[in-house]
Swiss-Prot record:
HAMAP family: YcdX_phosphat. The lineage of its organism: Bacteria, Pseudomonadati, Pseudomonadota, Gammaproteobacteria, Vibrionales. Binds 3 Zn(2+) ions per subunit. Its cofactor is Zn(2+). Zn(2+) 3 binds at E74, H101, H131. One of its GO terms (molecular function) is phosphatase activity. It comes from Aliivibrio fischeri (strain ATCC 700601 / ES114) (Vibrio fischeri). PANTHER family: PHOSPHATASE YCDX-RELATED (PTHR36928:SF1). Keywords: Hydrolase, Metal-binding, Zinc. The keyword Metal-binding applies. It comes from the Bacteria. Coiled coil: none annotated. This is Probable phosphatase VF_A0774. It holds the Pfam family PHP.
């Protein structure tokens, strides 16, 4: 199978990534990737931008190098299940990932992580949960993924985690999470988690996982741009006028 949307990418605005959005779009165009979400880290992450950065994404063209640009953010899960972007930002974004990051949310125990994830899902402010395979943030797979399925929040399959070079110990957990998502009928999304433009749209590990467990493609929201946009509509997000031509 081929993934056509990358829902987790970073620019140098994240503080520890190395490309501009134009460079990311050019790399995507060279790869033949028709759409990606730009999802820089929210402000609690060291080096990340002020929330005005996300409000002002309205100035971004909807297409750069003929690649569709989805305006997004990777928010940090903090406290007992909040995210670190003000509610006033929500209307400026098309796509919000919520993730645990050690500098913001020190690793605790499975119950605390599970409760935080469920609270984030039920807030209805996030569209996906990012890189859940991290063993530092163990959680009750069944409880969280069942809640995500109920609220139509996507579970991210993260290609960087599956490489085994960061968030060490994630690979087997990613496979198990995907199997639980398949069993419970949850949606999954796919993120390169690119911090450099040459990694945009690179999904060899994720595609292998999807093939290995025969994950149903109608639940992979990034299989086509139309499936991704249909998922945004399911989430209650307003249609993006400039993307109407992609709904075929």
């Amino acid at each position: 199978m081929r993934i056509q949307v990358d829902t987790h990418t970073h620019t140098y605005a994240s503080g520890h990534a190395y490309s501009t959005i134009i460079e990311n779009a050019f790399a995507a165009s060279q790869l033949g990737l028709p759409m990606f979400c730009t999802t820089d880290h929210a402000s609690s992450m060291p080096g990340a931008p002020h929330y005005w950065f996300f409000n002002n994404q309205r100035v971004l063209p909807r297409f750069i190098h003929n690649v569709a640009i989805v305006r997004g953010c990777e928010a940090n899960i903090c406290n007992d299940g909040e995210i670190d972007i003000p509610p006033s930002v929500d209307s400026h974004l098309d796509w919000v990932i919520a993730s645990f990051h050690e500098p913001v949310f020190p690793s605790k125990d499975s119950l605390v992580h599970t409760q935080a994830l469920i609270k984030v899902i039920r807030s209805n402010r996030v569209d996906a949960l990012g890189h859940l395979g991290n063993p530092n943030f163990d959680f009750d797979f069944e409880a969280v993924i069942a809640c995500a399925a109920e609220y139509n929040v996507a579970i991210e399959l993260n290609n960087t985690s599956l490489k085994g070079e960061t968030r060490i110990g994630s690979i087997d957990r990613c496979y198990e999470i995907a199997k639980v998502a398949k069993k419970l009928g949850a949606y999954v999304t796919t993120g390169s988690d690119a911090h450099f433009c040459e990694d945009i749209g690179k999904f060899s590990k994720v595609e292998q996982l999807i093939d290995d467990i025969d994950f149903p493609l109608d639940k992979v929201i990034t299989h086509t741009p139309k499936q991704f946009l249909d998922f945004l509509a399911l989430r209650g997000r307003a249609p993006i006028e400039e993307f109407k031509k992609l709904m075929v």
